[in-house]
Amino acid sequence: MSRSIKKGPFVDAHLIKKVDTAVAGKDKKPIKTWSRRSTILPEFIGLTIAVHNGRQHVPVYINENMVGHKLGEFALTRTFKGHAADKKAKR
């Protein structure tokens, strides 16, 4: 079930504060955050946000197609190495 429209999108308060200071200061440094649950707002467009994936911070450049999605969708937490090749199929 999606979030109620009357509540509005959820964004952590500390992330909004960091974005506001970056926009006001024209700062191009990535904003480091652990808040994967925050929704991307139109104010974030053009910023680079380093989202934590459990091991490191993955830089995510925000564009207009990402608005409305969560930050965690763009920082993958699992790495797929591929399945082992079948020995019978090789012969």
Curated annotation (Swiss-Prot):
PROSITE patterns the record matches: RIBOSOMAL_S19 (PS00323)
Gene Ontology biological process terms, A to Z: ribosomal small subunit assembly; translation
A molecular function (GO) term: rRNA binding
Parts forming coiled coils: none
SUPFAM superfamilies, alphabetized: Ribosomal protein S19 (SSF54570)
Keyword rRNA-binding: yes
Family annotation (Pfam families): Ribosomal_S19
GO CC, alphabetical: cytoplasm; small ribosomal subunit
Keyword terms, alphabetized: Ribonucleoprotein, Ribosomal protein, RNA-binding, rRNA-binding
Keyword S-adenosyl-L-methionine set for record: no
Similarity annotation: Belongs to the universal ribosomal protein uS19 family.
General function of this protein: Protein S19 forms a complex with S13 that binds strongly to the 16S ribosomal RNA.
HAMAP family attached to this UniProt entry: Ribosomal_uS19 (MF_00531)
Name used for this protein in its record: Small ribosomal subunit protein uS19
Organism name: Bordetella petrii (strain ATCC BAA-461 / DSM 12804 / CCUG 43448)
